[in-house]
Design a protein with these regions (language model features):
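Conserved phosphate-binding/catalytic region of the ribokinase-like
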Residues: 4-5, 164, 195-294
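Substrate-binding N-lobe of the ribokinase-like
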Residues: 3-4, 24-91
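Short N-terminal binding/cap micro-motifs at the start of the first secondary-structure element
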Residues: 13-17
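Ribokinase/PfkB-type carbohydrate-kinase core domain
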Residues: 1-10, 70-84, 96-229
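Hydrophobic residues at beta-strand termini and immediately following loops
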Residues: 58, 105, 232-233
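Short glycine/proline- and charge-enriched loop/turn segments
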Residues: 21-30, 178-180, 230-233
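Short, conserved phosphate/pyrophosphate- and ester-handling motifs at nucleotide-, phospho-/glycolipid
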Residues: 48, 180, 246
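Gly/Ala-rich phosphate-binding loop of Rossmann-like dinucleotide-binding domains
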Residues: 49-50, 149, 258
Length: 294
């Protein structure tokens, strides 16, 4: 089975459960609080490992985040390439309303302190045909894409959170894009974000060698490449917390492809896994194991 390198964010999530998302000028009390492991990179690595893949996590944290390494190890994620020499780990302040919606404030911390020499040292351990999973919560993404491509890695990119500098990245070297309709419209500079077919066609045409996986909330998910277009409706589930839904989706889609499933099956398994995730509280801990999905 292919090795997977997830070079991404590692956050300490500080989660407040509230009646509703705080409004400007408003002060309210939470009815519960907890701290847990998170970050898109961490969540996606956890999803891949829980789906039964051979996954390696790389990134940077401070001593305050060492518990995250222990948790990842408990899910059989290899953590050898996580650097722990930063002062402060990334932080996420997460509000979760009673209807399961969330609002997130990020503080990058160590996530934007990854050096090119650290990246080079890590990439030495991976070779042609291995997967490189990236999100936009760390620095040097353009360097990672270029160096990963040089080594023949299969690059999967989730351009979230979207920033304008993404447009300067060597995106033509990406094999799989995981986007929602807003991110896809931003990449293609499509004005009408409600015209989902146009957005999907625009990003497919902009990157003809890539597979496009686009999620559209309650409209479900789409896969597009060449003349192939597949739609997967959502799977209804009670919504408790949507925090790691997208990360679960990406992890289980990639895991399904690596296991040999076709894109229709991969979309279904990814959607099913996300439905399980949103029915539970938390990020990494809410992601299901493979025996619940496949």
């Amino acid at each position: 089975m292919n090795k997977i390198l997830n070079y991404g964010s590692l956050n300490i999530d500080k989660i407040f459960s509230l009646d509703h998302i705080v409004k400007p000028g408003e002060t309210i009390s939470s009815y519960s609080y907890k701290s847990s492991a998170g970050g898109k990179g961490c969540n996606q690595a956890g999803a891949l490992a829980k789906a039964g893949c051979d996954v390696y996590m790389a990134g940077k944290m401070g001593p305050d985040g060492l518990f995250i390494i222990d948790l990842l190890k408990s899910y059989n994620v290899n953590t050898d390439y996580i650097k722990t020499n930063a002062k402060v780990s990334g932080q996420a302040l997460i509000q979760v309303s009673k209807d399961g919606q969330n609002s997130i404030i990020l503080s990058a911390g160590a996530n934007i302190e990854n050096t090119c020499s650290e990246i080079d040292e890590t990439l030495k351990h991976f070779s042609n045909g291995d997967f490189l999973i990236l999100q936009n919560e760390i620095n040097n993404i353009d360097y990672l894409i270029n160096k990963g491509y040089e080594k023949g890695l299969i690059i999967c990119f989730n351009p979230s959170p979207f920033t304008d500098n993404i447009l300067s990245f060597p995106l033509e070297k990406v094999s799989y894009f995981f986007v929602n309709e807003i991110e896809a419209a931003q990449i293609t500079k499509t004005n009408n974000t409600n015209d989902y077919d146009k957005i999907l066609n625009d990003i497919k045409n902009k990157f003809p060698s890539a597979s496009i996986i686009m999620t559209i909330g309650k409209q479900g998910a789409f896969y597009a490449k060449d003349n192939i277009k597949v739609h997967q409706p959502i799977i209804d589930a009670p919504v408790v917390d949507t925090t790691a839904a997208g990360d679960t989706f990406m992890g289980y889609f990639i895991a399904s492809i690596i296991k040999g499933y076709d894109v229709e099956e991969a979309l279904f398994f990814a959607t099913k896994a996300s439905a399980v995730t949103v029915s539970k509280s938390g990020a990494l801990v809410s992601i299901p194991f493979e025996d619940q999905i496949f």
